[in-house]
Amino acid sequence: MPLYFAEHKHTADTCPTKQPEMMQMLGQHVSQENASKFGIQIHSDVVLPGQHHLMMVLAAPTQEPVDKFMQPFSMVGTVEVTEVRTCDQVVASGRC
C-alpha cells in the first residue's frame, strides 16, 4: 500500500490546545480506530513541541482518503500531503 507524508502547521493563535473541545476532537480523530474508517493505517505521528507542527506517515490505497482524513486540521492551519517511499523501496527500484 502506498505511503503518504501528511504535514499540518498552525500558528500559536490558532493552536487547538486553546480550545479543549477542538483538542479532544482532533485527539480522537488521530487514532488508529478512526483512521481505519478511512482505510488508513497510521505508521507514525509526531508533533514538534512548541512549533505547532504535526507530521504523520500514513498508508492508504490512494491519496484521496488521506486528504479526507487530514481535512479537520485545515480548520486551524495548513495541510500538505505527499506520496513517499521508504529507503528500502528506493533501493529496490533503483529510482529516487
Residue map of PLM features:
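Short S/T/G/P-rich N-terminal loop/turn motif that feeds into the first structured element of a domain
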Residues: 1-36, 41-52, 61-64, 87-96
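Conserved RNP beta-strands of RNA recognition motif
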Residues: 56-57
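Short amphipathic alpha-helices in soluble, non-transmembrane regions
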Residues: 66-74
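A common structural junction motif
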Residues: 73-81
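Short acidic-hydrophobic, aromatic-tinged amphipathic segments that line or gate anion-handling sites
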Residues: 82, 86
